[in-house]
């Protein structure tokens, strides 16, 4: 992502992911968001980053993902000297692809060196990425208690399964934004398709997570959705580093 001649502001929606981002000479780790926020890129500035899919953040970070919920931290503050050295190397690269390759290599190594990745949470996160999934059924399906499931989600994702379910459902709505704008489908039908109890439920979640009504959100996002991502579940984003795990974000 590059800034225009004037400062470029972009609204960031919660998506269940943790990002490693290089911007303005700083290497930042953006924790999992629970509400939308605005990111600005100065004129002529660039942002390069990688997105970690829901469920692997805790392993890559080396600490509970919940500690970075709704927060941005310098890599040195999370990874110490390793984070500082990575920031220096990325800063020495002169092109975007070189920086992206360094970030991808670093995340792949941290994932390989991690003691373990919580495969149960990964499986649960994938299930929540599709319409028709029910949080209430996850514990029984995975053979653990509700309390254990919540704890493991907080460690690996950054918040509980209900919050992730709400966020992924919002992402599915965003993918339907073109249909909302063209009025090919009404909001009540879309809400039902995506697993909302009714249109009012969709409206409440949109306001809670973004501060916008469903229609306003659709208008704001319709022209920002890549055609290849429309109608696809959030966990179906293009993968750059390793299957199912780390996806590119620019």
Where in the sequence are the language-model features?
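Alpha-helical bundle regulatory/interaction domains
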Residues: 1-146, 156-161, 175-197, 213-250
């Amino acid at each position: 992502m590059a800034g225009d001649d004037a400062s470029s502001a972009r609204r960031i929606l919660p998506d269940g992911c943790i990002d490693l981002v290089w911007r303005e000479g700083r290497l930042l780790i953006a924790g999992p968001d629970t509400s939308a926020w605005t990111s600005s890129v100065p004129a002529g500035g660039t942002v390069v980053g990688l997105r970690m899919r829901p469920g692997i953040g805790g392993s890559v970070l080396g600490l509970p993902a919940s500690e970075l919920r709704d927060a941005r931290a310098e890599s040195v503050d999370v990874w110490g000297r390793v984070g500082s050295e990575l920031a220096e190397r990325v800063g020495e690269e002169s092109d975007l692809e070189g920086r992206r390759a360094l970030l991808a290599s670093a995340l792949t190594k941290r994932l390989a060196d991690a003691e373990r990745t919580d495969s149960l949470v990964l499986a649960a996160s994938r299930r929540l990425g599709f319409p028709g999934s029910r949080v209430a059924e996850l514990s029984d399906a995975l053979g653990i208690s509700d309390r254990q499931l919540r704890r493991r989600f907080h460690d690996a994702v950054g918040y509980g399964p209900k919050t992730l379910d709400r966020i992924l459902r919002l992402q599915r709505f965003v993918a339907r934004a073109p249909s909302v704008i063209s009025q090919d489908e009404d909001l009540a039908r879309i809400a039902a398709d995506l697993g909302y109890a009714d249109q009012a439920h969709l409206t409440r979640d949109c306001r809670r997570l973004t501060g916008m009504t469903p229609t306003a959100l659709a208008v704001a996002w319709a022209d920002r959705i890549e055609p290849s991502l429309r109608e696809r579940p959030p966990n179906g984003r293009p993968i750059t580093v390793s299957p199912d795990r780390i996806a590119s974000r620019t």
